[in-house]
Amino acid sequence: MNNSNRSAWLIVITGLIVACLCFATAGAGLTYLALQAAAQSDVASRPSSLPSSGRTTSAPVVAPTVARTPVAGNSTINSTYQDLVNAVLPREDLADIAVRFKGVPASEAQFSCPTLSKGYEVGATRTFTLSNQDDNSQFVATARLEYKTPHAYMWVQTEPERVRLNLNRLRQAANDFENKIYPTTRAFFGEEESPGVDCDVHVHVLHVTGVGRTVGGYFSSVDGYPNEVRSDSNEGQMFIMHAERGYNGSDPGSESYMSTLAHEFQHMISFNQTHAPSLWLEEGAAQLAERLNGYAETVTSVYDFAANPDTQLNTWGEGTAGGNSAHYGGGYLFWSYLYDRFGEDIVRKLARSPERSPQAFIKVLADSGVTNSETAKPFTFEEIFSDFAVANYVGRQSIEAGSNRFNYATIDVPPMSTRNSLNNGDYPYNVREAVPQFGTHYYELKGSKPVSVTFAGSTVVPLLPAQNSDGAFWWSNRADQSNSRLTREIDLTRVNSATLNFRTWFRMEEDYDYAYVSVSEDGGVTWKTLETPDCTTDNPQNANLGCGYNGSSGGDTPQWIDQQVDITPYAGKKFLLRFETITDAGVNREGFAIDNISIPEINFTDTGNSDAGWKSEGWTRVENTLPQSWTVQAILTGSDGKITVQRMTMKDNTGTLPIDLGGNVRSAVLAVSPTTQVTTVPGAYDLQIR
C-alpha cells in the first residue's frame, strides 16, 4: 500500500499526575489530546427516580440576542445550509503537498514494499525525532530495543537520559498488546498500514522523557511518511509513551498504560482505514477502543461532560486537554449510545466507513435498512441527537420496551447537571439564555400545580462570528485533515503590472493549520505561496509551506482585513491563482473567508455573488446566516413512576407545552437543544414557565 491520500496526525494522550489524582492539561495543536484514567468521581450512577443532580451548568455562553428573522422554507440560506452539511472536503495529503509545494519528485513521495525488511533485533539502537508539547520544539533521542513480539517493538530511551523500566513488566505488556489489544482493536476498527513506510510489520512503542509535562503519550502519522515528504518522520508506525516517573509509560502493564496503547492503536488504524474530519468522533472512537479492550474504567471524561452537558458535541476546543475533557466525554458517550441502540455490527461499519462523520453514519444506517419508525424515513443526525440528549439524562432506565432509544444498556452515565431546579415558589419563571449547538440545557420542574412551558428560539444563527460581512463571500468550510482549494486562471498577458486585492476573515488553529494564496505557472503541477501583508513565515511545527495565514485575522478577535498583493512578477503571463487551506487532524477552527477579490488592471472583480470562473474544491459561496433549528422535549415522570418523553411542536421555533405537575406528572425535566450543524455560534432562546 502506498501513502497517497493521507494526512498528518499527531495524537497526544495526557498523563495522569497521580500525586493529586487530577488530570493535567496539554497544549493543543497538531494533536489529539486524550484523557487518561483518574480517580472515579464521587457522582453515583443515576438512581431509578431521576432526582435532581444538585448541580447546575455553567453561566450563559454569551449575552444572547434572540434573532427572530423569518426564514422561508425555500430560502437561499436553507439550500446553502444543506450544501454545507453535505460537503465532503478534499483530504489533506502530505505526499501530494510535498510534490506541489516542495518540488519533491512524485516517485520519492510514495513508498512501496516489494519485500519486507529484516527489521530490528533486541539490543539494536537508533535515534528518533520527538516533539515537546510544552514549547512546541523538537529534539532527538536514542533508544535501545529491549523486547519484540511478532507485531511490536519495545524501545527504551538511553540518551539524553536513560529511562529505567521494569523489563519483566515491559515484556508482559508487549505480550498483552500482541495477544489482546492488537487482535481486538483490529477486529472492530480495521487494520493499520502494515507493512509501513519501513516495510516492517512491527508497531514501534518508544518509551521516552521530555515530551511535555502533561503528555502521557502520542501517535504521530508524520512518522508514516518518507523523509522526503517530512524531514522529521521516524519512518515507522509508532507510539510514543512518556516514561518519566508517574506517567503512563513508566508503568508497563498498568491499566493506564494498556488503555493508552488501545487508544492510540485505534488512531493508527483510523489513519489508514478512514478519513476522520470530525475530531469529536475520532476521539470518541479511541475511547471506545479502550472500553472494547476491557479498560472502561479508564474513561472518566464522562464526568466532565455530565458536569457540562451544554458542551457542543460536534466540535472541539483549541485549548488544553483538561479544557477539552467534556468533549472527550461527549464523543465517548455518543459512540456508546450508538453501540447500545443500533448494535455492534452497525457501529463497526461506521468505524470502518471511508468517511467518519455524522453524514457517514446516517448513510451507514440507511444502507443497513434502518429507518426512523416515527417518520418511516432515514434518520437525520438531529433526530438521533435528540434521543441521545434524553438518554444522557435517563441513563440505563428503559423507557420504550424492547428498545434502547432513550437509554443506555451497557454503561452507567453520571447525572447530568441542570440549568435550574424549579418548584412551586419559582413560578412564573422567565429566562433568556444561549446554549452551544448540539449542547443541552436541562431544567428540573416540580410543583403541586400544572404549568405551561412557552419557548421562543432564534430562527437564524451566524455561520461565523464575523462582524461586518458584506453580503456573499467565499468560505473554505472547516474540517480536520482537509485541503480546500479555490482556483482560477488569471491572464496578465496584456499588462505590465498588476495588483491582487481582497478582504479576508480567518481563524486557523495556531501553529498547525494554514491558509495560503499561491500561484502555479505549470498548470498546477507545482505551486508557490505569495507574500501577503498578513501572512507569516514562522514555522514552529514544520507545517507552514511558505508564507501562510495563521491564527486570527486582525487580532485575538478575528476581523475582516484588506489585503493588497503585488503580482507584477507575473505580468505578461497566464497562471493559476489559488486560495487554499490545509488543516491537520488535531483541531479545526472557523476557517478562511475571502471577499471582494479584484485585479483592477484587467478589470476583474468578484464580490462573491457568482462563481466568477473559480473551480471550487471544498469552498462554498455563502452569506453569514444559517437557519437555526431546535429540539425542546420534556422527560416526564408520571404519578405511577413511569417515564415518558414528550416533544414540543413548534412553528417558527416557538411553541407551548403544558405539563400536569401535581396531577398525572410527579416531576419533569425540560431539555433544550439547538441543532444547527456547521456553526459553533450558540443559539439563543427565551423560556417562560407559568
Task: Locate the predicted segments by residue.
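Beta/coil-rich, acidic/histidine-enriched accessory regions frequently appended to metallopeptidases
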Residues: 357-485, 503, 511-518, 587-592, ...
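Juxtacatalytic substrate-recognition/specificity segment
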Residues: 148-285, 295-316
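Exoplasmic/lumenal beta-rich domain surfaces
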Residues: 518-574, 622-631, 637-654
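Ser/Thr-rich, Proline-interspersed low-complexity disordered segments
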Residues: 20-23, 38-69
